[in-house]
C-alpha cells in the first residue's frame, strides 16, 4: 500500500467534497478513510488514501490538489503517511 494523507481546510462552500473525490476517482486514488467536519462555517476534512494503483505520481497529485484547492478557495495538502506521522507525533 502507498498511503497518502490529504487534508482540506477552508471556508465551507458547496461542492468541496465532490471536487476532491472526483479528482481522486479520475486518477484511481482509493479513499481508505475519511473524516469531515464543519466548525463555525469552516470546512475541515482528512482523508487516508492509497495511491498504489494511481494513474498519476505523488508529485503530480500534490500539484494538482494545490491547484484544485486554489480554484475552490480551500487549502489542500497531500503528504506521504510516514511524513505526516513524523510531523504529528505527540
Task: Label every model-predicted segment.
Residues 1-90:
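A conserved regulatory-domain signal marking ACT and ACT-like small-molecule sensing domains
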